[in-house]
Amino acid sequence: MTSNRKNENEIINALSIPTVSNPSTQMNLSPDARIEDSLCVAEVNNIDPFVSASTVQTGINIAGRILGVLGVPFAGQLASFYSFLVGELWPSGRDPWEIFLEHVEQLIRQQVTENTRNTAIARLEGLGRGYRSYQQALETWLDNRNDARSRSIILERYVALELDITTAIPLFRIRNEEVPLLMVYAQAANLHLLLLRDASLFGSEWGMASSDVNQYYQEQIRYTEEYSNHCVQWYNTGLNNLRGTNAESWLRYNQFRRDLTLGVLDLVALFPSYDTRTYPINTSAQLTREIYTDPIGRTNAPSGFASTNWFNNNAPSFSAIEAAIFRPPHLLDFPEQLTIYSASSRWSSTQHMNYWVGHRLNFRPIGGTLNTSTQGLTNNTSINPVTLQFTSRDVYRTESNAGTNILFTTPVNGVPWARFNFINPQNIYERGATTYSQPYQGVGIQLFDSETELPPETTERPNYESYSHRLSHIGLIIGNTLRAPVYSWTHRSADRTNTIGPNRITQIPLVKALNLHSGVTVVGGPGFTGGDILRRTNTGTFGDIRLNINVPLSQRYRVRIRYASTTDLQFFTRINGTTVNIGNFSRTMNRGDNLEYRSFRTAGFSTPFNFLNAQSTFTLGAQSFSNQEVYIDRVEFVPAEVTFEAEYDLERAQKAVNALFTSTNPRRLKTDVTDYHIDQVSNMVACLSDEFCLDEKRELFEKVKYAKRLSDERNLLQDPNFTFISGQLSFASIDGQSNFPSINELSEHGWWGSANVTIQEGNDVFKENYVTLPGTFNECYPNYLYQKIGESELKAYTRYQLRGYIENSQDLEIYLIRYNAKHEAINVPGTESIWSISAESTIGKCTEPNRCAPHYEWNPDLDCSCRDGEKCAHHSHHSTLDIDVGCTDLHENLGVWLIFKIKTQDGHARLGNLEYLEEKPLLGEALRRVKRTEKKWRDKREKLHLETKRVYTEAKESVDALFVDSQYDRLQANSNIGMIHAADKLVHSIREAYLSELPVIRGVNADIFEELEGHILTAFSLYDARNAVKNGDFNNGLTCWNVKGHVDVQQSHHRFDLVVPEWKAEVSQAVRVCPGCGYILRVTAYKEGYGEGCVTIHEIEENTDELNFKNRVEEEIYPPDTGTCKYYTENQGTRTCGNECGSRNEGYDNAYEINAKSSLEYRPTYEEETYTDVRRENHCEYARGYINYSPVPAGYVTKELEYFPETDTVWIEIGETEGKFIVDSVELLLMEE
């Protein structure tokens, strides 16, 4: 790699073999320090083609710069950072995005499709233009934040760019191509999260609404998890796919692990620190993971000499190399002393090599005890061992020669020379290099410079200042004729001293502890933590961290912990052995679950403390659990004066919770505190930060739960949370023909409602279940919900209040009914103007509502001056309605009915948190008023009782007259349809059978009404059974009738009449009969105009009889009509009638499904005077109660004849000579003996 970095130690001829007499001499190398080797040809840049230094350089540079701008950076820092970022990812030269893609393709030997490549590169080019435009606008605005135009431009460009990158991300995770696209995806995801952070930093200043700022923040949190999981998943997939069996496959495997750690996982580890609400000031993060540069062994052998490459020289297997090189999870440590042992490979005096065959490495955790590891041959002292000192030194660069010697025909691979460039980070003037050097005259040499694989973060400063990694450990690959050292490295951000600096949040991974206590293990990190983590399964201490306090000791701090746990537990902390914090922390995952991003939570203690010594020991432990799993990623030290949004949230929540209770009694709920308000306070508490105030949150939750229990206790409603709605029957089922006993006294228990009323799970507005009432297409069939408060729940002379929360409504009617009806019609506009009748809940099985996001509530506090019976244009979402109760009587059990009703097509309502509670005792004028109301009601009830007695007697006599006896199982022979209708009308004149406000609710006279109505239903059924003519009352239109010409069926209330408007029309039906039996043909009809109406019965051409109808008025005024009825026997069909000819009941059930074409209007025989009580008249009584309905309208005549058929089939034919013939019913009744 050609580099222009300013390196004072740069070696001009890096491949020469040093001939320094003292192999451990520290060398102050300069450009003049040149040592030549005439035997070997240097091949400096001949690295494997799939190793792209440019890719690694960009990844390291970006991660390094991000580490400097975590939290809330200064404006100047951020402007400079974005300028750097745009320059790195969209420079003037070759596109780095293409390099990212090609590099991973070469590592895994899989190429993306041409379409994927072209689409991704083109989209990234567009994003580059957008970012450059945004960066320029940001710099302009930062120079003058008060300039309105600059503010408008930056906001416009921000919104456009954020949307663009949001839609672009999916293009970088194409199915089956996720791994080669991974580095592109990670860099793009990083750009998106940094951009989302800007909304939190500047959104308010740009003029964003707080809800918009919060929305961007919530997206940042959501995408952080999504992007992290994707990167870790496909990193692991790609790495596992490269797992092989031989040394060459391990080399590629390790390169993937190293380069994608630098380009992907390092970024992922920093994503959580972009959260400005958790990190509102500058934040120092640390990466403790280890990566491994390539083994120091020849890889560039010329053609024909491939066996001299180390991985072809009888190298160990993949698994053997991995076991020798990859360190098990461990505490972070630093090397202090390296002793290298050598051996000799000699073919002749001109071809020989002394080389590295083993080593002993001393290393130490921060503040911990010294540890030693040995690898290879360490007992050969024939060649003096070389000892190199690294204490307090960062080895930021290694240069190593891979040599090769030929012994007979067997190549020997070894390292005869290595130089370790170092600097003391605590004293920058202490820098230099220490060298291992042995004689070498082999057949080839290859230089390995660690900066080729781990370049500095910038080329603008010397590498001893800008280095990105430091040497942490050394492994050794051992074969029969192979020794290949492998250097491992940690990121420079993981400092040696655990220093807590001023004015910043300091993150310290717990693997930087000086020791591990009994029961603690270090486990491999899940990929997004930036290093290994600690685990305990039982109570005890994790470890001790030696801290260097670089701030005044008066500075106070709070501690936070990033952890994962399968159980609730307590964490405790100690400083120099003194306990400073103990707190409860909640479970974050289930036992057996994999460690995922969401498994970890950052939570802390609210009590601040200060350090007593500049050198202090911090201890973290856990207790109150056993046989569970607790993982610790890091601890964070936060200056106590740092104000978090979480603090404001806690303060607001505390005030809100305390405001639920009275000032004199903190265990008594305020009267004006609604159930809905308690739920909202509960949401407020639930949204508090676990990281900041877990203990306070739990305490507040207990108080809110207690308030909720008090609210439930005072609420007289049954099932206020809408777990079930009983008896959801449609109005058709309570028609005059229904089975009324299906609605009985059980209606006093819980909620009852119509079929279209639905229970919905909680949403962003309601914490618990709520109900929706849609519109209806017929106001006589409303959608409704009701409940009765029993008399036993009420106190005498007390005012009660119904209240609840209405999310939105239109034409919602609310009733409270006792002596009379208190009524209110309510319109409450919501966030949507209207919602579909069939709208379903947006809450899915896997999706929970976000109640922590701020919601814009439409007109939440609109006052309404409406009074009873008036209709408001707009109401408050908080609805209340009062009712006064006088004397109570458990035997009478009057109670209070609560009714919610929608009777318009455009009507709708969403409501919940309903309460019915005692408001106050009645005194003074209120008491006198309720007594007057109660007396009036009792007087009217007495009058109703007397009236009911009279009406019931008349109705019962009329009903009884229809039947042969009191068994009510046989009709009188002369009982016809008109008589049944007449009796039914009398039955329906019984008032107070059902509430006029909602006729599904039984009234005081329901029992006697249902008794008589049951007999009426029996009469209709018996009538249908004895009439041989199918559909003789035309309730089912013309079903079962044969028709020629034009005829109509007209409807008047519940009556259906056949209208024959012209002489050429014909209506007929074939009827099955019993030969030899006698029948009565009975017809009720009306004739308009001239001519005759004829109903004929016959068998083929013989045995014919007829009934003739004339207009009575015409008979008196006009000359007699000479026309006679004709027999319509020709061409009559023999259409059969089966089950399609329904009963009269079926006709009534479908009454409103027939659009009869009425051409005749007539006055009823008599008018009924309708009764109006203290409640308003319910005009829907027409649909079910026969008000103003005439069983036999004026002008209709009933005629009959006897007929004795001789065959099993007769024909009944209807026709006329002229004018209009109207037939109400046709009956063919079997004579009784």
Curated annotation (Swiss-Prot):
It comes from Bacillus thuringiensis subsp. morrisoni. It comes from the Bacteria. This is Pesticidal crystal protein Cry1Bc. The keyword Transport does not apply. GO terms for biological process: sporulation resulting in formation of a cellular spore; symbiont-mediated killing of host cell. Belongs to the delta endotoxin family. Toxic segment of the protein is located in the N-terminus. Keywords: Sporulation, Toxin, Virulence. Promotes colloidosmotic lysis by binding to the midgut epithelial cells of insects.
